[in-house]
Amino acid sequence: MENPYIKQFPQLMAGKKILYVHGFASSGQSGTVSRMRTVMPQATVIAPDLPLHPQEAIDLLRRVCQQEQPHLIVGTSMGGMYTEMLRGYDRIMVNPALQMGDTMVSHNMMGAQHFQNPRQDGVQDFIVTKALVKEYKEITTHCFEGIDENERRRVTGLFGDEDTTVDTFDLFHRHYPRAIRFHGEHRMDDRSFMQSVLPVIRWVDDCQEQRSRPVILVAFESLIDSWGKARGSAQKAYRWLAETYSLYIVAPSLPNEPAQMGEVTRWVEQYINVPAWGRIIFTAHKQLLLGDYLIDPAADSELGGFMGTHIRLGDDTFKTWDEVITFFERLGGQ
C-alpha cells in the first residue's frame, strides 16, 4: 500500500551531506535514515552507529564532522543531545534528550537492553549500569557550553506535543530561540517527518543557498471556517504550497483585543503547525504588504490596492482550496 505521507524531493539538499545522529538503543540503519534517503535522493545521508559510552560517541561524531563537513546535522532523542554539542553546523534536534542520564533512570532503561535496529558490529544486546548512567549525566553537563549568537541562529529544536519520554522544551528554549512544538510522539514516524522535520530542512537549504521563493500571503480568514476549524483542504493546500513558495499568514491586528493575537497563534499552531512557525503577520493594513500573491476572501475593493495577484477564495474561480491548488499547479512554481 502506498504511503500517503512519503514523496520525493530530488532538489532538496541536492549534492549536500546530512549527518543523522540516532537515538538510544538504535543504529545508523534506523527507519528514519531510510526515510531521509528516500525523500532526498540527491543528498548523502551519513549515519554512523554510535558507541554505547557517551564520550566515545561524541568523539566519533566530532571525527565524522571533521572528515565529512556535513551541511546539516539531524539528531533525535539521545542523538539530539549529541547534536547540540556539535558546534559550527546547521542542526535540527528532534525531541532531544538533553538530560539523558535522568531519562534512563526515570524510564526504566537500566539493566539488560536490546538494540532496536541492526548494527554493523553485530551486537544485539547491552547492559545499562549505574556507572554508564553516571557517564551520561556527566556528558550532558557540557550541553550549551560556549554558545554564541551565531550558534543560536543555526539550531532548531522540534518537540512532539505527545512525547511522554522526554520534555526538554523549556530547557532548550532558555538557550535557543527556535523551539517548535510539532504534532507527534517521541518516535518519529513518516507523518511527523514529512510535516514537521522536512519543512525545517527546507528552510535550512534555502538559507544556505540564499534562495528566494515567490511569496504567498494567506489571509487567516481563508484558513478558518465558521466553526473555528480548518476549512476543507486548507491544511493540505498550505503544506503543498509551502513546498514551492514562501508562505506567510496575515491576521488582523485589533488594537482593543490584544488577546486575539494569542488565539490566532494557538490556532495556527494547532492546524498548520511547523510550516507556519514564525510566519504570522499581524496588521490592520494588509494592502500595504509586499507579496506576489494574496489568498483572501475579501473583495478587491476591501484591499485598497494590493500590488500583487489577489486570489479571492470563495468566488466563482476559486470556490475551494482545491481550486487554488489547481491554479498553482498550472503556474509551475512561478
Give the ranges of each region predicted by the language model.
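Asp-based phosphoryl-transfer active-site loop
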Residues: 209-230
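Active-site catalytic motif of lipid deacylating hydrolases and related acyltransferases
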Residues: 5-67
